């Protein structure tokens, strides 16, 4: 008998650990296929709701928010890249240059959920790739439209 499970995944597109967490969750659910039928719904969480238009240099942002040094940031990027590789999510090897406001991306994800949970899941994955692999501006409506069309 298959058990039904509803999962609310609360995350921000700009968070690399959220990309890793989603990939790890997908792997775990794949292993439970036939035993667990999971309904995955994405809930918004803005890490940086006050992020200005045009975003901010990622190194500057991490130093201001967490007090980290460039050396610490390089180490954590390496850790993130390795953990991502472990769960099948490839990050841009050069990291990201900027961090952007994700409010409109969350609005788009909400709309996608109203259409279909599968569409929301596909959009979430496309947005994570656009942000973490391609370094796209997550506040750009053009970027969001391309992700929605993918």
Tell me the role of every PLM-derived stretch.
Residues 22-131:
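Structural alpha/beta surface segment adjacent to cysteine/selenocysteine redox centers
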Residues 3-16, 21-25, 40-43:
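Short active-site neighborhood of thiol/selenol oxidoreductases, capturing the structured segment around
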Residues 63, 148-149:
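Residue-level preference for well-ordered alpha-helical positions
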Residues 128-139, 148:
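Acyltransferase
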């Amino acid at each position: 008998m298959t058990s039904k499970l509803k999962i609310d995944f609360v995350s921000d597109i700009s968070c690399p650990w959220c990309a890793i967490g989603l990939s790890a969750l997908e792997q775990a659910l794949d292993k439970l296929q036939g035993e667990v039928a999971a309904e995955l719904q994405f809930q918004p969480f803005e890490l940086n709701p006050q992020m200005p238009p045009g975003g901010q240099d990622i190194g500057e942002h991490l130093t201001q928010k967490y007090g980290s040094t460039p050396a610490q940031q390089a180490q954590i990027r390496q850790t993130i890249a390795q953990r991502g590789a472990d769960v099948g999510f490839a990050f841009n090897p050069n990291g990201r240059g900027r961090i952007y406001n994700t409010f409109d991306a969350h609005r788009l994800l909400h709309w996608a959920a109203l259409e279909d949970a599968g569409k929301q899941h596909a959009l979430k994955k496309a947005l994570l790739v656009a942000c973490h692999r391609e370094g796209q501006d997550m506040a750009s409506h053009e970027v969001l439209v391309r992700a929605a069309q993918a």
